[in-house]
A protein has these predicted regions:
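Conserved NAD(P)H cofactor-binding loop of Rossmann-fold oxidoreductase domains
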Residues: 91-96
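Active-site helix of classical SDR
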Residues: 123, 159
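Conserved glycine-rich Rossmann-like NAD(P)H-binding loop of the short-chain dehydrogenase/reductase
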Residues: 29-46
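Substrate-binding pocket helix/loop in short-chain dehydrogenase/reductase
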Residues: 99-112
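Conserved glycine-rich cofactor-binding loop
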Residues: 8, 15-16
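Residue(s) in the substrate-gating loop at a strand-loop-helix junction
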Residues: 143
Length: 272
């Protein structure tokens, strides 16, 4: 029997990419779902398909996580009506590429609110009932950018570093109360993130599929790992960075961006 069969998972940013793959793979494993993103119409079409294919319950919550009221709204429509969440997947987020001083400040502050503030708020809301039940788990979608500062992705890499260290600390706080916390750190993945952000030419390595990334994330939390790097090449790079001065890794990343002549000002997409 599947580890997730009969359990209920909440996936944020579920309309595209990694979030959509989390929803599809969890439903295929027999999990009931609550899926949320701004695009309610797309979510409702997904929900109908998943219900038909896998005979699971799928609830749709249209919510903009840039709205401070959204985490409470999502909580009220799940735990608040007797639908306990066994797994929270904090996936919603976005990135931007460009010189920090040239990128719009309001968008960079929105990035912090979505990638960090909403993630913390949702974790705080849903962790409490998990701890009371002494059962559950949270997956935070971070990035390989969490392991060093990334020039031209300065705010984005900083938000993902927060997600990683927050997850590692929370995992230890919760381990004796039978709640698992895990950070999933993917590298280049075949979503629309790089294309819209203007970085599609940056990495010539073979990207992973969202399904490969999600499989790694689910395996990690099932095994109680506090973080996992998805993909052998990404694991090698993340491991090797431990042996180099931080300034070396940061400057190497800057040279790579300059080599590919990325736009010095631009916007990235929301992952959800």
């Amino acid at each position: 029997m599947s580890y997730w069969r009969g359990k209920r998972a909440l996936v944020t940013g579920a309309s595209f990419g990694i979030g959509e793959s989390f929803a599809r793979m969890l439903a295929a494993s027999g999990a009931h779902l609550v899926i949320t993103a701004r695009s309610r119409e797309r979510l409702e079409a997904m929900a109908r398909k998943l219900q038909e294919d896998h005979s699971v319950e799928v609830d749709v919550v249209g919510a903009d996580l840039l709205d401070d009221a959204a985490p409470q709204q999502i909580y009220d429509l799940t735990e608040g009506v007797g639908k306990p969440i066994d797994l929270l997947v904090n996936n919603a987020g976005f990135g931007m590429v460009g010189d920090f001083d040239l990128l719009p400040l309001d968008r960079q502050l929105e990035m912090i609110r979505l990638n960090v503030t909403s993630l913390v708020a949702l974790s705080h809301k849903f962790l409490k009932p998990m701890l009371a039940r002494q059962s559950g788990g949270i997956i935070h979608v971070a990035s390989t950018a969490a392991f060093q500062g990334v020039p031209y992705f300065a705010v984005y890499s900083a938000t993902k570093a927060f997600v990683l260290t927050f997850s590692e600390a929370l995992a230890v706080e919760c381990e004796e109360r039978n709640v698992r916390i895990s950070a999933l750190c993917p590298g280049r993945t075949t979503t629309n993130f790089q294309q819209v952000a203007g970085t599609s030419s940056l990495d010539t390595s073979n990207p992973q599929t969202p399904e490969e990334v999600v499989r790694k994330g689910l395996e990690a939390i099932e095994k109680g790992k506090s973080h996992v790097v998805s993909g052998a090449q990404n694991q090698t790079v993340a491991f090797a960075e431990r042996f180099f001065p931080r300034a070396f890794a940061t400057k190497a990343a800057a040279r790579l961006y300059r080599r590919f002549k990325l736009p010095r000002e631009g916007n990235g997409p929301e992952e959800a």
